[in-house]
Amino acid sequence: MTEAKKSLKRTLVGKVVSDKRAKTVTVLVERRVKHPIYDKIMIKSSKYHAHDENGEYKMGDTIEITESRPLSKTKNWVATRLVQKAGLL
């Protein structure tokens, strides 16, 4: 009975909006929700601080973050992988 355990940690995908702090990136995660009365699709967003040990993620990159133990007062997420590199303007 060697079954692979499913990870209980949440993963989210978002866009890096700030990389000014050492070893930390701020990630904006957007989600779509339907209004319960008016049935309109709304976009809600949340910002998360994620740990970036090597400073490899830059502003505009789309990355995946995974829930972890508290690393500081506001940092409970770790940047795990790059989904899409930021394009040139």
Swiss-Prot record:
CDD domains: Ribosomal_uS17. The keyword Hydrolase does not apply. Signal peptide: none annotated. One of its GO terms (biological process) is translation. GO terms for molecular function: rRNA binding; structural constituent of ribosome. Transmembrane segments: none annotated. One of its GO terms (cellular component) is cytosolic small ribosomal subunit. The keyword Cytoplasm does not apply. Keywords: Ribonucleoprotein, Ribosomal protein, RNA-binding, rRNA-binding. It comes from the Bacteria. Pfam families: Ribosomal_S17 (PF00366). PANTHER family: 40S RIBOSOMAL PROTEIN S11 FAMILY MEMBER (PTHR10744), SMALL RIBOSOMAL SUBUNIT PROTEIN US17M (PTHR10744:SF1). One of the primary rRNA binding proteins, it binds specifically to the 5'-end of 16S ribosomal RNA. Part of the 30S ribosomal subunit. Belongs to the universal ribosomal protein uS17 family. This is Small ribosomal subunit protein uS17. It comes from Acidovorax ebreus (strain TPSY) (Diaphorobacter sp. (strain TPSY)).
